[in-house]
């Protein structure tokens, strides 16, 4: 067995098998394995289509009904049952749908990516048409369109690109009570509202005069007694239900003679002012608003919330309002207004506690995962289709009707296409690295349809709530306008069938911690006292201390006796997200820097050579495997044939399975996703064993950067303000080099003048330009290309005048095409270069490829470019410590240690204290210790909690978040590090070493902190940002150059820059900048001409912006004239001047976008 095989078997835990044996320096042993990090996406979509994961969960719930109930129907079954039956207006016909089935997909995920198609399966439904007059039933299996499928990585492939549907965080349906202080007095006003998943709101409120009112569908307020009468309550029923509440009794006595019909008319008048009010219209209005399932839907979660809050015992499957719901809501609000602590439930011997609701509490916010979002879109499509079906029922001959003739699937297909293609929640997948993709799938967004908007969202909804603990990460969120609106699911959390986030806890019985795990929602958790994971335990799992620190409702902390503790956290990393849990010594960092560290790990570029971190947190293997970018054995067996592209495994059941290895695939962000085989022929593999590493993985562990020898010291001012100095060795050895792949595409279409053509025969192009094109006119694989080089030769017909007979004869003799076609070849854009690594040709005429309307052929060319690290590139650590490379020093000039080892990177020590991210210093120290290896002699006090007594040089260690190694233990380990060959230790117990100046050989005056830090190269590369322009496009409106690299624009010389030149008196430079380099239209053409012909630069003219200010002043009735000492009319517009000068500006000045950047 090979070395790799031995390594894989050496470190296996659960379903994830890792080749790197990482020694944990944590004190807590986690009783619960980290769950599959993609469960949120996979489980939800599986419920939608009724897949095996949902069926297994349903079977398990039926055997042991605990926690939130699992939905009895799949999402597709639910939505087709809702729409059935569709009846015509007379009730003579009806159409029913049942048994939705997804057939096998047409193309594999890989083929869809290559061909630019959508990964989907045809959806069929059994449709049954019934004619009530004759009793005839016609049944057909009907095609309902192609239904996009989720890949096993939790993504969708739409038109060849990978997309992710982000889960939405919305307010849960239910009943809510809130207190708002009145503006002009110290009195508090109370209100209660019933919010459905779909339909009209019902709101009750107490005004400043202590009168209870109601708002129907958010319209005008009216006395609550009108509403009670309208729903059919008698005087006696009102007295029985509300006799104890004076505010309602007084209203009742005033309106004692009010009939139900009068109340209905009054309600209709207030909801529909201006229309003829009648009792029947009022009855229909209320029926449609609150008591009809087609118009009002509480949803399962809304019914659960209403029953739980009000204590009513309504059937959980009843999704409309009941009279008992309304009575209980009014009683609750009246009791809240009077300051009661609890209210009795009518017709029951129980009572419910009274409190107002915190709308930002996660017990009142729920997740709409991908399955529910797609189901809602399907529901909208079916509603549009329903209208078409009803219309066709009335227009078609009843005898000839079959289900197929009634159904038009276009509204359904359009609804799904619109959702996946344009919805705010269907996003282009972040494939910068595996962590970025995984985090994207676990993202929670409060934005989107039915959610908040970033302009209206206040501080409260963005802020961290105590209920976020263990459910939503308090650290990982964007820094810009979306801060707090977009979050990330915590490591151990899961979403229950109601959409509430649950987190696991260990049950504590009589002061003893058990291994029983219980998942709780934020509402359930509020009722218990919960200890933290780091609470010290004895070997028998009882608490060491008699009094234990616990967390209670609202995040309040108190110390209670051990026997009063109900639960305990399962892990120190329970409260944070996946990205944040990858930061070692997180507990020593300021939260702002931890946020930056979490976000910047997602920007790390996959490097040419991967290397796992010396100091990790233990989460690296979970992320690498669950992200889906490593190749994993699905069944145990023996590795057979191994090549760069395919690994064959002979499984224990006798079957041979081929695993295809991805080679140099372009990710959505233009990075190189490449897999490398890590097993050899003859190796034994188990289920879950890593067969091939993906991008940013090293032997099955996430590896985003490189371990570099770092020194914290200033060096000649080059690392001022976060700038970074690196060694030439990092460039020479490709330590931080990365490969980037660009995709270039061209299509041929049918035009009015004829078809475009891909060809090598291009007009007016020399052989030098087409030497690398093949006979088809497409670049050969392996060609080195630069800016302006032709990738695909293409000609387009152009219109021309009628030719004379002589011209036609000459053209026939010399076969000259240049006059009838123009060159529209695909060329390498400005600023790009590299090697052609792949070419794909899709043909709509000969092949089976489905291209767009009017497109005959499509060619895609992939160009790879290796980018070495260079000045201007951005580097970062995992602690929010980021900087730009300012200087690459020759290795001989770098500071070196006593044994001659030069450091790789020099950081400014002043970057640490102000940022308060001290974790980077501890990582540097522990990195040095693990690189050197250690052996603890004897039994010193500082080592009593360290389980790893000895580690070999270059060992990998983990310091879990909130459970890391202490500073005292690090200090002790420095004295246990293996010495060098001369018996000396290069770094002292304070983590510092004497460094020598590479230029002089003299030692620096003070010892310097030296160690190994994990450094990431971020996707902010200087090659993508550097830009220069000589001539280019101008804005049509201002006649000034466009802005930005994308528009090939100029560099803005703004107001303050002008002041600077004025201060220096640089009049000629300033005049040049404000005229011929900007918006002096005639002058810049003259200057271009003069430069080309070698003449002196002419005098600048008048810029367009000056003419604008003159016109503006004239428009303000200020008579301003420009007087010239010559004969020129200075105020004439540019076009007039061009005509007078006889200038043609078209070749030099392109009319660009109207947008100014």
From Swiss-Prot:
GO molecular function, one term: DNA binding
Pfam families: RNA_pol_Rpb2_1, RNA_pol_Rpb2_2, RNA_pol_Rpb2_3, RNA_pol_Rpb2_45, RNA_pol_Rpb2_6, RNA_pol_Rpb2_7
Keywords of the record: DNA-directed RNA polymerase, Nucleotidyltransferase, Transcription, Transferase
Annotated Gene Ontology cellular component terms: DNA-directed RNA polymerase complex
The protein's enzyme class: transferase
Swiss-Prot/TrEMBL GO biological process terms: DNA-templated transcription
Enzyme Commission no: 2.7.7.6
Catalysed conversion reaction: RNA(n) + a ribonucleoside 5'-triphosphate = RNA(n+1) + diphosphate
Signal peptide (UniProt feature, chain positions): none
Subunit structure: The RNAP catalytic core consists of 2 alpha, 1 beta, 1 beta' and 1 omega subunit. When a sigma factor is associated with the core the holoenzyme is formed, which can initiate transcription.
Family to which this protein belongs: Belongs to the RNA polymerase beta chain family.
Role summary: DNA-dependent RNA polymerase catalyzes the transcription of DNA into RNA using the four ribonucleoside triphosphates as substrates.
NCBIfam families (alphabetical): PRK00405.1, rpoB
Protein name: DNA-directed RNA polymerase subunit beta
Species in which this protein is naturally found: Tropheryma whipplei (strain TW08/27)
Gene that this polypeptide is encoded by: rpoB
């Amino acid at each position: 067995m090979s070395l790799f095989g031995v390594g894989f078997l050496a470190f296996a835990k659960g379903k994830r098998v890792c080749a790197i044996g990482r020694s944990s320096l944590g004190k807590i042993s986690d009783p619960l394995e980290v769950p599959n990090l993609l469960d949120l996406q996979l489980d939800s979509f599986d419920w939608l289509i009724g897949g095996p994961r949902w069926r297994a969960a349903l079977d398990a719930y039926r055997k042991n009904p605990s926690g939130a109930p699992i939905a009895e129907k799949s999402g597709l079954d639910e939505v087709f049952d809702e729409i059935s039956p569709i009846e015509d207006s007379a009730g003579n016909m009806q159409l029913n749908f049942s048994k939705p089935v997804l057939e096998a997909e047409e193309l594999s995920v890989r083929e869809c990516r290559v061909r630019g198609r959508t990964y989907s399966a045809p959806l069929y439904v059994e449709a049954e048409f019934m004619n009530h007059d004759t009793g005839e039933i016609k049944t057909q299996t009907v095609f309902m369109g192609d239904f996009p499928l989720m890949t096993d990585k939790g993504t969708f492939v739409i038109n060849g690109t990978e997309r992710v549907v982000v889960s939405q965080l919305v307010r849960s349906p239910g009943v809510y009570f809130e207190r708002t202080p009145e503006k002009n007095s110290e009195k508090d006003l109370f209100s209660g509202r019933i919010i459905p998943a779909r339909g009209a709101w019902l709101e009750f409120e107490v005004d400043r005069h202590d009168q209870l009112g109601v708002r129907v569908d958010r319209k005008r307020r009216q006395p609550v007694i009108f509403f009670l009468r309208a729903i059919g309550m008698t005087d006696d029923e009102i007295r029985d239900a509300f006799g104890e509440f004076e505010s309602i009794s007084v209203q009742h006595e005033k309106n004692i003679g009010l009939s139900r019909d009068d109340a209905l008319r009054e309600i209709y008048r207030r909801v529909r002012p201006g229309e003829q009010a009648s009792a029947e219209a009022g009855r229909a209005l209320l029926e449609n608003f609150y008591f009809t399932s087609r118009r009002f839907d509480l949803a399962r979660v809304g019914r659960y919330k209403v029953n739980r809050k009000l204590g009513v015992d309504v059937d959980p499957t009843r999704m409309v309002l009941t009279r008992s719901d309304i009575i209980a809501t009014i009683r609750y609000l009246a009791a809240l207004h009077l300051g009661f602590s609890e209210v009795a439930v009518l017709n029951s011997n129980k009572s419910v506690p009274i409190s107002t609701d915190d709308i930002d509490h996660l017990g009142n916010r729920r997740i709409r995962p991908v399955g529910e979002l797609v189901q809602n879109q399907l529901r909208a499509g079916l509603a549009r289709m329903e209208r078409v079906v009803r219309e066709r029922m009335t227009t078609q001959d009843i005898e000839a009707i079959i289900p197929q003739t009634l159904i038009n699937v276009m509204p359904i297909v359009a609804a799904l296409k619109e959702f996946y293609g344009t919805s705010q929640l269907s996003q282009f997948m972040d494939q910068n690295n595996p962590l970025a993709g995984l985090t994207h799938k676990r993202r929670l967004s409060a934005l989107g349809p039915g959610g908040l908007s970033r302009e209206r969202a206040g501080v409260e909804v963005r802020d961290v709530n105590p209920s976020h603990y263990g459910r939503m990460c308090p650290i990982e969120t964007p820094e810009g306008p979306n801060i707090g609106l977009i979050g990330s699911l915590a490591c151990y959390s899961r979403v229950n069938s109601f959409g509430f986030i649950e987190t696991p806890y260990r049950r504590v019985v009589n002061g003893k911690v058990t291994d029983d795990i219980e998942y709780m929602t934020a509402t359930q958790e509020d009722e218990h006292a919960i200890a933290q994971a780091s609470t010290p335990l004895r070997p028998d799992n009882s608490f060491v201390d008699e009094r234990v620190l616990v967390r209670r409702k609202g995040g309040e902390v108190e110390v209670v006796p051990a026997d009063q503790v109900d639960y305990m956290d399962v892990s120190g990393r329970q409260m944070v997200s996946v990205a944040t849990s990858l930061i070692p010594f997180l507990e020593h960092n300021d939260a702002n820097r931890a946020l930056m560290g979490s976000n910047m790990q997602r920007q790390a570029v996959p490097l040419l050579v991967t290397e796992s971190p010396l100091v990790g947190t233990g989460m690296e293997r979970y992320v690498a495997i669950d992200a889906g970018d490593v190749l994993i054995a699905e069944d145990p067996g023996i590795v057979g044939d191994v090549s760069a592209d395919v690994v064959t495994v002979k499984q224990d059941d006798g079957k041979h399975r081929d695993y295809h290895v991805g080679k140099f695939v372009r990710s959505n962000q233009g990075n190189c996703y490449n897999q490398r085989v890590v097993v050899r022929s003859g190796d034994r593999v188990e289920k879950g064993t890593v067969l091939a590493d993906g991008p940013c993985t090293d032997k099955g562990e996430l590896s985003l950067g490189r371990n570099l020898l770092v020194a914290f010291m200033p060096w000649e001012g080059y690392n001022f303000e976060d700038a970074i100095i690196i060694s030439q060795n990092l460039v020479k050895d490709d330590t931080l080099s990365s490969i980037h792949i660009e995709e270039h595409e061209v299509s041929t279409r049918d035009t009015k003048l004829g078809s475009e053509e891909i060809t090598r025969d291009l007009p007016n192009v020399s052989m030098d330009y087409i030497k690398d094109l093949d006979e088809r006119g497409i670049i050969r694989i392996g060609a080195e290309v630069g800016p302006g080089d032709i990738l695909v030769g293409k000609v387009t017909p152009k219109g021309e005048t009628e030719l004379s007979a002589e011209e036609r004869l000459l053209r026939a003799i010399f076969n000259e095409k240049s006059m009838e076609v123009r060159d529209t070849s695909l060329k390498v854009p400005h600023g790009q270069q590299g090697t052609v690594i792949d070419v794909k040709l899709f043909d709509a005429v000969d092949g089976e490829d489905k291209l767009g309307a009017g497109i005959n052929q499509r060619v895609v060319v992939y160009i790879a470019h290796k980018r070495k690290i260079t000045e201007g590139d951005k580097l970062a650590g995992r602690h929010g410590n980021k900087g730009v490379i300012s200087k690459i020093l020759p290795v001989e000039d770098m500071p070196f240690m006593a044994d001659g080892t030069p450091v790789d990177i020099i950081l400014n020590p002043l970057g640490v204290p102000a940022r308060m991210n001290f974790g980077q210093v501890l990582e540097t120290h522990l990195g040095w210790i693990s690189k050197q290896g250690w052996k603890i002699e004897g039994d010193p006090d500082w080592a009593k909690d360290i389980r790893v007594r000895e580690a070999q040089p270059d060992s990998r260690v983990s310091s879990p978040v909130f459970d890391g190694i202490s500073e005292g233990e690090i200090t002790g380990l420095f004295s246990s590090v293996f010495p060098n060959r001369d018996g000396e230790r290069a770094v002292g117990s304070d983590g510092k070493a004497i460094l020598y100046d590479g230029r002089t050989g003299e030692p620096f005056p003070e010892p310097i902190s030296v160690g190994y830090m994990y450094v990431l190269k971020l996707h902010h590369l200087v090659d993508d940002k550097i830009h220069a322009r000589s001539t280019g496009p101008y804005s049509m409106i201002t006649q000034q150059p466009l802005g930005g690299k994308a528009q090939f624009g100029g560099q803005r010389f703004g107001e303050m820059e002008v002041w600077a030149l004025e201060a220096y008196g640089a009049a000629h430079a300033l005049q040049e900048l404000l005229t011929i380099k900007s918006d002096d239209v005639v002058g810049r053409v003259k200057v271009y001409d003069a430069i080309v012909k070698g003449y002196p630069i002419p005098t600048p003219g008048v810029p367009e912006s000056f003419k604008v200010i003159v016109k503006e002043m004239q428009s303000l009735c200020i008579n301003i004239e420009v007087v010239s000492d010559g004969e020129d009319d200075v105020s004439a517009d540019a076009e007039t001047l061009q005509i007078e000068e006889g200038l043609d500006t078209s070749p030099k000045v392109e009319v660009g976008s109207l947008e100014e950047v």
